[in-house]
Amino acid sequence: MSIRERRLISWTPRRIRTTFLAYLALTKPRVIELLLVTTIPAMLLADRGTVDPLLILNTLVGGMLAAAGANTLNCVADADIDKVMKRTARRPLARATVPTRHALIFGLVLTVTSFCWLWLSTNLLSGLLAVATIAFYVFVYTMLLKRRTSQNVVWGGAAGCMPVMIGWSAVTGTIQWPALVMFLIIFFWTPPHTWALAMRYKDDYKAAGVPMLPAVATERQVTRQILIYTWLTVLTTLVLALATGWLYGAVALLAGAWFLVMAHQLYSGVKRGEPVKPLRLFLQSNNYLAVVFCALAIDSALALPTLL
């Protein structure tokens, strides 16, 4: 029996499934959920609910390919860190279930495909924004900022804000002020979201030598920063109300008050020296962003009268 025949026989249904799941894990599907939560509302706001469904579908497909490519290349660059941290030790490259070379090729193919898809199905600007996002996330955040500064997620988080820009540009072919405000909402939301999780896994970051803020600062300093960025997030969502109807404005105000209460509770608990549960803020921050952007989508789909 030849080597080729033995390799073909070794591809059992179980191995095929395991390999598929390993490559899927490289793309970090849960991270891609942010794309869905923010891109559709941005597109609906750009044209007040009259967007072609096919354009939305094409933008989502291209955006998901871009996010998958960025996440895969991130896994390649972070393979050494992932092996050390308990939270990431089961990732495919950390466990060597996918060869590094194959993961790199997979990530590059996804990147090129995302650019071509967005360029051909939407416009050149959206494709270029996707490639710029991937380059920024991999080279600026992952390879430069993440290992050198405690403010890594502040500036590196800009990559996670780009889906709204891509969605807006896919509809209009331009970038206008509401898109920039949505960018800032996610930009300010990212530090509280990420640092709350990092507080739970700060020992992991210390062991890996990653200067995430909770790993190098006191809990009081971290929660103070979380509080500041939470306020900035909520205030920015209210600025966006100028371009929306009353529904979004009301939901942004109520959800913002709820988000602020949770951030203040975390800060107050740390200040009093009480046991705190930062993971709760991390989980609820996801719900907060989803509620705000879902309200934006509904408001835009209904084409409610805007203030401006």
From Swiss-Prot:
Domain of life: Bacteria
Pathway(s) annotated for this protein in UniProt: Porphyrin-containing compound metabolism; heme O biosynthesis; heme O from protoheme: step 1/1
Any one GO molecular function term: protoheme IX farnesyltransferase activity
Gene field: ctaB
Organism: Mycolicibacterium smegmatis (strain ATCC 700084 / mc(2)155) (Mycobacterium smegmatis)
Function: Converts heme B (protoheme IX) to heme O by substitution of the vinyl group on carbon 2 of heme B porphyrin ring with a hydroxyethyl farnesyl side group.
InterPro entries assigned to the protein according to its UniProt record, in alphabetical order: Protohaem_IX_farnesylTrfase (IPR006369), UbiA_prenyltransferase (IPR000537), UbiA_sf (IPR044878)
Keyword Cell membrane: yes
Gene3D superfamilies: UbiA prenyltransferase
Compartments (UniProt record): Cell membrane
Entry keyword Transferase: yes
Transmembrane segments: 31-51, 53-73, 102-122, 124-144, 149-169, 170-190, 242-262, 288-308
Entry-linked HAMAP family: CyoE_CtaB
Gene Ontology CC terms: plasma membrane
Name of the protein this chain belongs to: Protoheme IX farnesyltransferase
Catalysis performed (reactions): heme b + (2E,6E)-farnesyl diphosphate + H2O = Fe(II)-heme o + diphosphate
